[in-house]
């Protein structure tokens, strides 16, 4: 949010409300002795103390000390540490840590404004939706689905509509432009079942959690950590420390941990390694367990307002996010991002100011704390993880190596070093005994299933009402009746849906249902997208 320059006296940074001489184009990150040890700087004649304070700063892979660029790190990959390219005229020296106390004094005024604005944003957002809840519960007239109604009006009128709260303690729908002109508070939902702070073990969620405790009563929100099975060891340890700290400070604050019922490596065997095209792990290991746990009465998906640590600086995609958004990742969730416009420097300054522990992963050089392995992680982070958490990474890395070798890739090590495993687009390395073959579609849809995961008719009820048995019957779709037959010989099923060629829409739905019956592995991802609660995976 603020502009940043080096502070040569403290070895830290200064914040400015406008561009000044020496303003940095990229937000730096603090570098601690653990990272310098990993890079082997001490073996090149440099000396520095092993202390809590950072020693220097990094801008991408350039390392700066009191405003002077000392060296660059070149050529890191998952197997190989980088080489250090010392800048001309720079000789090994004794490095002095950042004077954090003085740096915090010099940045205190602007940080005070920044954090209080975030607290006010959290409080205002919480109060707006908490009051909407009270209004919603006051009268049956309020319990209409105003959000769905607004969407329908939008489609008909071809203009953006908004749900607003009126002075008479009711809701109304009006054009968004009119609502903004009249100063109405636009609501993305008329009812929130649960307020949560999402905690990941990273610095951003750590700051947001603390801001939430300063803005919202501890009885009114929950802290949820998703243990994906990919967690870095220090992230798990930090979560336990954070839980103990806040439980002591706020005994009524609830902490919950969401986990999938199955091991992530089991899913690797069934679905294949995640890739930049098939990023299944986020929905299966994180989103599905989290929102399944939050379901309310009647198996319905809870309407949730999540305070998250998303920051625009992190990626081009996130730079386009609104500070409050509905359906960003999940249809029934509103995401509120209090620190959307903060820089990583400001996040670290907050942690330093209040004496919060820094995740060990940052101290060892990881730029973004997340999963232990990820198709979107950088070669740099892959290198740091493999050299500092090798034992935890090994089961995943060995699985990748085995897959690459099995596919007879020449020079598998270079293939993995270059990150080519992350670009898997097909299912060549998935060895499944289940298969489906659509034999014909005119006039009848004839299909053969081999070793399906479910009975072929399991999902047909989601398409239309049907009567009959597992062998034959009828289904009624758009006032037309279609008969079906299902025969099986061991693990092979043959199905025929009569005269369905006259309804391509029905054939498309049947194909989806049969595909799901063939390959469904109970990952739970579909259940949390069901808006009515009719779908349940067990």
Spans of features found by a protein language model:
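Mid-to-C-terminal catalytic subdomains of enzymes
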Residues: 343-344, 348-395
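Charged, amphipathic alpha-helical linkers/stalks
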Residues: 384-447
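Short, glycine-/Ser/Thr-/acidic-enriched flexible segments
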Residues: 313, 379, 500
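ATP-dependent adenylation/nucleotidyltransferase module used to activate substrates
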Residues: 2-346
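Ferredoxin-like iron-sulfur electron-transfer modules
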Residues: 502-525, 533-538
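Short Lys/Arg-enriched alpha/beta "domain-start" segment
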Residues: 1-38, 428-507
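Local cysteine-cluster metal-coordination motifs and their immediate loop/turn environment
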Residues: 367-380, 517-532
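Short cysteine/histidine-rich zinc-coordinating motifs and their immediately flanking basic loops
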Residues: 383-389, 531-538
């Amino acid at each position: 949010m603020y502009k940043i320059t080096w502070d040569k006296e403290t070895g830290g940074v200064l914040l400015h409300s406008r561009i000044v001489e020496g303003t940095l184009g990229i937000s730096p990150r603090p570098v601690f002795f653990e990272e310098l040890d990993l890079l082997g700087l001490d073996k090149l004649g440099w000396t520095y103390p092993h202390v809590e304070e950072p020693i220097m700063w990094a801008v991408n892979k350039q390392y700066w000390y009191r405003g002077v660029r000392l060296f660059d790190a070149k050529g890191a990959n998952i197997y190989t540490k980088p080489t250090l390219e010392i800048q001309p005229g720079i000789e090994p020296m004794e490095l002095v840590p950042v004077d954090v106390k003085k740096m915090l004094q010099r940045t205190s005024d602007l940080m005070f404004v920044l954090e209080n604005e975030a607290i006010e944003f959290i409080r205002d957002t919480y109060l707006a939706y908490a009051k909407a809840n009270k209004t919603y519960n006051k009268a049956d007239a309020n319990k209409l689905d105003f959000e769905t109604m607004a969407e329908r009006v939008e489609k008909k009128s071809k203009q953006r509509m908004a749900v607003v709260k009126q002075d008479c303690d009711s809701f109304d729908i009006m054009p968004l432009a009119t609502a903004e002109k009249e100063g109405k508070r636009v609501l993305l939902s008329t009812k929130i079942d649960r307020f949560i702070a999402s905690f990941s073990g990273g610095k951003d969620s750590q700051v947001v959690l603390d801001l939430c405790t300063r803005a919202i009563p501890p009885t009114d929100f929950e802290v949820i950590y998703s243990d994906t099975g990919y967690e870095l060891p220090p992230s798990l340890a930090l979560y336990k420390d954070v839980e103990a700290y806040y439980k002591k400070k706020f005994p009524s604050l609830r902490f919950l941990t969401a986990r999938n019922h199955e091991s992530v490596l089991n899913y690797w065997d069934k679905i294949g390694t995640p890739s930049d095209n098939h990023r299944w792990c986020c929905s299966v290991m994180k989103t599905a367990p989290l929102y399944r746990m939050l379901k309310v009465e009647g198996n319905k998906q809870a309407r949730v307002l999540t305070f998250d640590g998303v920051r625009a600086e992190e990626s081009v995609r996130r730079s386009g996010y609104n500070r409050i958004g509905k359906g960003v990742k999940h249809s029934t969730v509103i995401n509120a991002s209090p620190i959307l416009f903060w820089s990583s420097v400001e996040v670290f300054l907050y942690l330093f100011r209040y004496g919060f522990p820094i995740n060990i992963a940052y101290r060892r050089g990881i730029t973004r704390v997340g999963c232990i392995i990820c198709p979107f992680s950088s070669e740099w982070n892959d290198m740091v993880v493999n050299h500092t958490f090798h034992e935890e990474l090994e089961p995943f890395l060995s699985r990748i190596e085995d897959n690459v070798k099995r596919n007879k890739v020449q020079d598998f090590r270079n293939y993995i070093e270059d990150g080519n495993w992350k670009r898997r687009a097909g299912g060549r390395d998935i060895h499944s005994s289940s298969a489906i073959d659509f034999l014909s579609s005119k006039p009848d849809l004839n299909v053969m299933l081999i070793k399906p995961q479910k009975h072929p008719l399991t999902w047909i009820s989601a398409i239309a009402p049907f009567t009959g048995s597992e062998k034959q019957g009828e289904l009624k779709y758009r006032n037309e009746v279609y008969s079906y037959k299902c025969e099986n010989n061991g693990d092979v099923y043959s199905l025929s849906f009569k005269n369905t060629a006259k309804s391509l829409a029905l054939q498309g739905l049947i194909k989806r249902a049969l595909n799901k019956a063939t390959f469904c592995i109970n990952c739970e991802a579909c259940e949390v997208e069901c808006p009515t609660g009719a779908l349940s995976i067990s």
